[in-house]
């Protein structure tokens, strides 16, 4: 069966939803060789993955994942990575900011793949440990306001493909599927993507899977997987069974533009220091503004604010008062 799919891919033809599912099932059953899996992943990449293929992968990978039984629906804020921009961990800062505002957050993340510091690397540098216990993470979400989900603990099938992916050394369909695999009970998601084409494909894949309330975005002018303050950001908003496309520029809500270099990060320790300064409200205004605007869009998606402008002003004031730092210190068992 795998050889038939390989032949189809080599001819530049797309797999169906069910055929893509079969590929993942063959990985799970260990019926596909490493050579065949490498060929499938490279072939899909060369011809271009389509929404049905992404949806098929996500469907099985999510079904096989260990689930987080949180009672209170949560939001996830993450990105695909792979934009080669080396920004600091903006979505991680947003996750703690939202939680400090009373929004339940299920932060799904991993270690660095293409950047110097993945979200989990930075979260650990901030002094937090990752649990592999679904019940413990659910309690963290329900009682503390934020749970940290280290992806490899919860996605055994993905783990079976790690060796081949590492040896290939390129982005594959797993990079698109990964951010769509949060195993917690979600009420919404904001998801940054490294390219416009992939963003559209991921949105359409989510529509096929009947997912809802997901805001996909891509910083078009500077090519980042964040809502940008250096230029235009394009969005695909999946809500109530349809996808709306729109764009945003900083001037739309009265924010000045910043140079892309303003948001450069470093290793995990350096990025943790940047986040600490943001949480305290003593960071550069550019850093506070980009966290505030990304947080504002999440609040808007969740219906917590009527406009992004309202959300931005509220979040910026909250950060400047050091409220995020107070919350983070409480999580760490300290008094700010």
Swiss-Prot record:
Mg(2+) 2 binds at residues 225-226. 5-phospho-alpha-D-ribose 1-diphosphate binds at residues 79, 82-83, 87, 89-92, 107-115, 119. InterPro entries: Anthranilate_Pribosyl_Tfrase, Glycosyl_Trfase_fam3, Glycosyl_Trfase_fam3_N_dom, Glycosyl_Trfase_fam3_N_dom_sf, Nuc_phospho_transferase. Its EC number is 2.4.2.18. It catalyses: N-(5-phospho-beta-D-ribosyl)anthranilate + diphosphate = 5-phospho-alpha-D-ribose 1-diphosphate + anthranilate. It is an enzyme of class 2 (transferase). GO terms for molecular function: anthranilate phosphoribosyltransferase activity; magnesium ion binding. Anthranilate 2 binds at residue 165. NCBIfam families: trpD. Homodimer. This is Anthranilate phosphoribosyltransferase. It comes from Dictyoglomus thermophilum (strain ATCC 35947 / DSM 3960 / H-6-12). The gene is trpD.
């Amino acid at each position: 069966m795998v050889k038939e799919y390989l032949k189809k891919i080599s001819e530049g033809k797309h797999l169906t939803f069910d055929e893509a599912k079969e590929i993942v099932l063959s990985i799970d059953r260990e019926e596909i060789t490493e050579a065949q899996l490498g060929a499938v992943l490279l072939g899909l990449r060369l011809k271009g993955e389509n929404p049905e293929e992404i949806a098929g992968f996500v469907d099985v990978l999510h079904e096989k994942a260990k689930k987080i039984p949180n009672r209170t629906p949560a939001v996830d804020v993450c990105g695909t990575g792979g934009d080669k921009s080396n920004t600091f961990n903006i979505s991680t800062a947003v996750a703690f900011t939202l939680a400090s505002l009373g929004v339940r957050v299920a932060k799904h993340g991993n270690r660095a793949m293409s950047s110097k510091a993945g979200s989990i690397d930075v979260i650990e540098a901030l002094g937090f440990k990752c649990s592999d216990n679904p019940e413990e993470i659910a309690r963290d979400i329900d009682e503390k306001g934020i749970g940290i989900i280290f992806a490899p603990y919860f996605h055994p099938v993905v783990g079976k493909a790690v060796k081949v992916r590492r040896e290939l050394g390129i982005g594959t369909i797993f990079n698109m599927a990964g951010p769509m695999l949060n195993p917690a009970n979600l009420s919404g998601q904001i998801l940054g993507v490294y390219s416009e084409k992939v963003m559209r494909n991921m949105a359409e894949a989510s529509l096929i899977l009947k997912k809802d309330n997901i805001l996909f975005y891509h910083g078009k002018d500077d090519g980042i997987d964040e809502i940008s303050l250096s230029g235009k950001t394009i969005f695909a908003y999946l809500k109530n069974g349809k996808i709306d496309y729109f764009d945003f520029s900083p001037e739309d809500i009265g924010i000045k533009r910043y140079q892309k270099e303003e948001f450069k990060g470093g290793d995990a320790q350096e990025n943790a220091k940047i986040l600490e300064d943001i949480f305290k409200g003593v960071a550069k205004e550019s850093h506070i503004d980009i966290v505030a605007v990304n947080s504002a869009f999440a609040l808007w998606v969740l219906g917590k604010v009527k406009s992004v402008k309202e959300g931005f002003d509220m979040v910026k004031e909250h950060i400047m008062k050091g409220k995020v730092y107070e919350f983070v210190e409480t999580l760490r068992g300290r008094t700010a």
